[in-house]
Amino acid sequence: RYLPT
């Protein structure tokens, strides 16, 4: 979503 995790 926000972080590329």
From Swiss-Prot:
GO CC term (a single one): extracellular region
GO terms assigned for molecular function: serine-type peptidase activity
Protein keywords: Hydrolase, Neuropeptide, Protease, Secreted, Serine protease
The UniProt record lists the keyword Protease: yes
Gene Ontology BP annotations: neuropeptide signaling pathway; proteolysis
Tissue: Found in the crab pericardial organs.
Cell compartment(s), UniProt: Secreted
Primary location group: secreted
Protein task: Stimulates cardiac output and hindgut motility, modulates visceral and skeletal muscle in many arthropods. Also inhibits activities of the human peptidase neprilysin (NEP/MME).
Identification of the protein by name: Proctolin
Native species: Carcinus maenas
